[in-house]
Amino acid sequence: MENLIGYVAAFLTTVSFLPQVLRVVMTKQTRDISRNMYIMFFLGVVLWFVYGILRSDLPIILANVVTLFFVTIILYYKLTEGNQT
């Protein structure tokens, strides 16, 4: 049961990034997104991923791999967009 809760929580928190990723990819605009927040979030997700590996916790690992992918897309657009903040 606790694994099911972990998978559902991981799914919901990870999928919550999908609308933002889709908007950024479609509009190519990140002006209203905080660069520093996403950099700190990226680093936090990397640490969660490492923690999941160290604990062999599949829900944590899977959620953070997908979240890293989404956050990397947003950060890529943010960092390559120019001087917009």
Swiss-Prot record:
Keywords: Cell membrane, Membrane, Sugar transport, Transmembrane, Transmembrane helix, Transport. Gene3D superfamilies: 1.20.1280.290. It is found in: Cell membrane. The chain crosses the membrane at residues 5-25, 33-53, 57-77. Changing N64A: Impairs glucose transport. It is a multi-pass membrane protein. Changing W48A: Impairs glucose transport. The homodimer mediates transmembrane sugar transport down a concentration gradient. Transport is probably effected by rocking-type movements, where a cargo-binding cavity opens first on one and then on the other side of the membrane. Homodimer. This is Sugar transporter SemiSWEET. It comes from Leptospira biflexa serovar Patoc (strain Patoc 1 / ATCC 23582 / Paris).
